[in-house]
Amino acid sequence: MRNRILFSFLAWVAVIVSVQGKQKDFVLQSGQPVAIACSGSEAPVVRTSLDLLSRDLQTVLSATAHIDTNTGNIIVGTIGQSKLIEQAGIDISALKNKKQAFMLAVSEDGKLVVAGSDSHGTAYGILEISRLLGVSPWEWWADVTPEKKETFRLSGKFRELQSPSVEYRGIFINDEDWGLMPWSNKTYEPSDVKGEIGPRTNERIFELLLRLRANTYWPAMHECTLPFFLTKGNREAAKKYGIFMGASHCEPMACNAAGEWKIRGKGAYDYVNNGPAVYQFWENRVKEVAGQEILYTLGMRGVHDGKMQGAKTVEEQKAVLNRVFVDQRGLLEKYVNKDVTQVPQVFIPYKEVLDIYHAGLQVPEDVTLMWCDDNYGYIRHFPTAEERARKGGNGVYYHVSYWGRPHDHLWLSTMSPSLIYQQMKQAYDQGIQKMWILNVGDIKPAEYQIELFMDMAWNLDKVSFEGVTAHLKHWLERELGTSCAKTILPVMQEHYRLAHIRKPEFMGNTREEEKNPVYRVVKDLPWSEREINERLNAYSELSETVEKAASKVPADRQSAYFELVKYPVQAATQMNRKLLYAQLARHDKEDWEKSDAAYDSIAALTQHYNSLENGKWNRMMDFKPRKLPVFNRVERNAATAPMTADRKAACQWNGAEAKKGNAIVCEGLGYEGKAAEIRKGDALTFSFGNLKTDSVEVDIRLLPNHPVHGDKLRFSVSLDGAEPEVIAYETKGRSEEWKENVLRNQAIRKIVLPVTGKKSHQLVIKALDEGVILDQVMLYEVN
């Protein structure tokens, strides 16, 4: 009995100790006020983030937040300058020596502690709470109404530590003439000043960047837009949101030459023949913004997107740039920091400037080298070992929207997420880790591509671990709900796959900025009647599924569904119908009325887009950017040449279907979504049976990317152990082959090989350089 009493007593004591030692959960209840402790000395970006969190708490929990300097349910602070964090009782050592990092942790007494390694980290930590509440970064920009909650709870064991993979992460608003500029200037922030995009608009953009954990902004710079720094209130808005201001390849020293030279410059924008005036133009701007967080672009091109004036040869241009570097860095040393190596600077070898760089241009060691894609998603240069070792590091400027040759893609933002992932992962692995900037056009409708890009820049390992499909799935679930996402995920995958084969903007088989006007005439694509009908049927299925799935979307997310899914998918469907039915009609195989009806559908869809949310997005969506011929109603005429004949392959494989070899399948990439990377020195083997022919034509179809190391991109082909044939397929920018490649998203090489009478044959394709990505292999009998 005595032992039993002792045992019961000890058990009771153990329970008491257990209860007393149990860590409390962090809990917020609907309608209950939330106290947030934060020092008044924190940076503006921290205060801004707290304002956004307060708004989110009100939306989700109907809870009013109060900011206090001493106590609260939530404790916020930056290490090294916040006593609140020092006294919070959590281990913050993991934050030391990190940039823009944050930690979220529930303390023993059930308080949520938000600690940042610097002000940006603290801000991102605050808005991580908004993410945990279920608030999408696209809450305002895509009308993703947050779901109401009765309770918000985090376990007492909750710990979260995050820091960026890439230091500077941001967007470039570009080609804004038909979307963001008129929408801002006439709808969202009406102004009597022509082309003004003011601080109200920019604050919305900066809020989006902050919620996406981005920190860098290249503002709109076309001639139609009043330059950012000439618009009252814009600079202050950037400071409020902790945004680093940068500028594109043709805007050195934070000067928008396209919009400002005619206002503030004198004479020609020519450093050879009018150097003092150009120097003064730059000097005036540096003096104005010396106290702002600026990433200064060095170098010089033309006033807009063209070559520099006054220097004709590459050697002359190189000499001018060497002089420009010295003078520009002298200005930074004079007005910004006497130690110029402490001023963030970037050099962007875009288009013809890359040729100057390759000719031996010496860029100062502390300047970031920013490499570019070819405007169609394929990065032109990856840093060498020497370039990776530079103090300034490496960056990338990447496009999901573009105006230029061979054809614009400004409308529907159909860049393959799988291509973005493959190229940006390769960029990171090759040492491009300092700065990532995405040309996003008008932001809408590139929402998903923007988030994928920013998520990779923030935490590349996480995106890499889950894969593109899972990332898209989670995004759709957050924006539209689990039920809808399950139905729409395969729709969006197929939407991107079909557009990878041919973007909606390229369906007229036209080209822009060519001397011969025949390129602007809508004409047949080199597709057979069977190929056309298969594509039409595929799009019809997508459109029908999207229409039916709308019933699964909550009423308060219907606008989001239209913006993120219905408009892009159905507009792409109708664009394909318009051009492909016209192609069939030219050959008397369809009625012209079907093409005209598709045009009318595009117009109606766009009108509805611009009427959403009581006209909130009026003027944002234009289905005829630049009024290119491909966007018009198709002119009725008869074909003058027969339609492409159907050609059936004896055998066909995608990259993943190799019988032997280490195929690194690129998830969702390519014509069939199963392209495969072949590492240098590795080979893939494809097997086929006996054919009634003595020779075969082998069509090898690859991703039209650029060399990873050096200037070569080669593979070899061998049949049945014969001597391998070496084939190169690298292209020069703006060459005819490059234009064809980016329009069809394939580089094609053909070779005829002899076949013996063996019952089984082995076709071996071996990568001789890094970067070979095999999409498809076609085998045709040669009669």
Language model regions located:
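Bacterial Sec-dependent N-terminal signal peptides
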Residues: M1-K24
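Contiguous, structured surface segment used for ligand recognition
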Residues: G21-S163
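The substrate-binding groove and active-site-proximal loops of carbohydrate-active enzymes
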Residues: V113-G116, D177-P199, N215-T225, W261-A277, ...
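An acidic-aromatic substrate-binding cleft motif
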Residues: W138-K194, R200-A220, G392-G395
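C-terminal non-catalytic alpha-helical accessory regions
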Residues: V144, K148-E150, L472-R626, L684
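Gly/Pro-rich turn-and-neighbor structural signature
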Residues: K149-L154, H222, F229-L230, A237-K240, ...
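Structured mid-domain segments that build the active-site/substrate or prosthetic-cofactor binding neighborhood
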Residues: L210, N215-W218, T225, G233, ...
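Extracytoplasmic
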Residues: D622-N783
